[in-house]
């Protein structure tokens, strides 16, 4: 029996603890078995420090996704749930390209995408070009700047905003974003992007251990992914309920939970099966 992945996405959407419109986070995850590379482009719906994976596309290649693949997965989301269900889309520096940003602009989809510091930006009023980094280089640590004029990057008109923030290694770096509209929201919205990485950790090592399956045939991996998406959502919802109604998850001195909500729910499900 072949699992219908559109139905999987609709089931997950029905199970979500909040109704839309939603902040979508697009990212890519990969794992390797010997010489085999499994590469997945994923759209997740962000919610309280996690992202629920809703759609994915397995890429039969190594490396980044291309514009066509990103457009295809977004078109699928719109076909299933409607454009009105999208509050905005956030994505990292990998997800930039003229054709891609043009498609988002044409569909009037609010987005907040990070760009590389060395990109050229043009002022459409004067034709002046400069590196986008030069517009934010003066920012001090934790300082933010929103530019309320429209600029052109990669041939497309957009708004710009930026901040100097510490990266995962604790080193301050510029975070520069392009937006379709509402640049004032860009930096706060973009903070939700990392929630999809929590989802990937749950899939890989913090719960489902997908890499231990050693599946390499894309058709089989695709079916497993579909089952795992439903299971991930179910485990998270059980974890929320148990945390609230049965026993709260212990909070560490750092302020973090001793165990993730998803893993808390997964362990409970495993104990009763």
Features from the language model and the residues they span:
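Single, function-defining residue in the core of a domain
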Residues: 2-10, 17-22, 33-36, 47-273
């Amino acid at each position: 029996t072949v699992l219908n992945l559109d139905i999987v996405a609709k089931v997950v959407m029905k199970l979500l603890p909040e109704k839309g419109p939603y902040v979508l986070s697009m990212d890519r995850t990969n794992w390797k078995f010997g010489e085999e590379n499994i590469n997945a482009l994923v759209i997740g719906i962000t919610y309280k420090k996690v992202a629920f994976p809703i759609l994915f596309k397995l890429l039969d290649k190594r490396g980044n996704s291309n514009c066509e693949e990103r457009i295809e997965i977004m078109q699928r989301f719109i076909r299933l749930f409607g454009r009105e269900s999208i509050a905005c889309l956030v994505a990292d520096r990998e997800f930039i390209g003229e054709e891609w940003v043009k498609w988002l602009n044409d569909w009037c989809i609010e987005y907040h995408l990070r760009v590389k510091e060395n990109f050229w930006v043009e002022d459409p009023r004067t034709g002046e070009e400069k590196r986008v980094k030069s517009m934010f280089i003066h920012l001090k640590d934790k300082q933010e700047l929103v530019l309320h004029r429209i600029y052109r990057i990669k041939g497309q008109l957009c708004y710009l905003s930026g901040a100097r923030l510490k990266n995962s290694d604790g080193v301050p770096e510029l975070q520069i974003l392009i937006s379709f509209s509402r640049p004032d929201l860009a930096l706060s919205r973009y903070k939700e992007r990392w929630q999809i990485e929590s989802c990937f950790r749950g899939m890989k090592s913090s719960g489902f251990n997908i890499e231990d399956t050693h599946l390499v045939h894309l058709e089989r991996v695709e079916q497993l992914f579909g089952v795992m998406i439903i299971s991930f959502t179910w485990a998270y919802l059980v974890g929320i309920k148990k945390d609230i109604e049965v026993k709260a998850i212990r909070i560490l001195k750092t302020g973090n939970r001793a165990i993730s909500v998803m893993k808390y729910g997964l362990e409970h499900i495993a104990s009763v099966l």
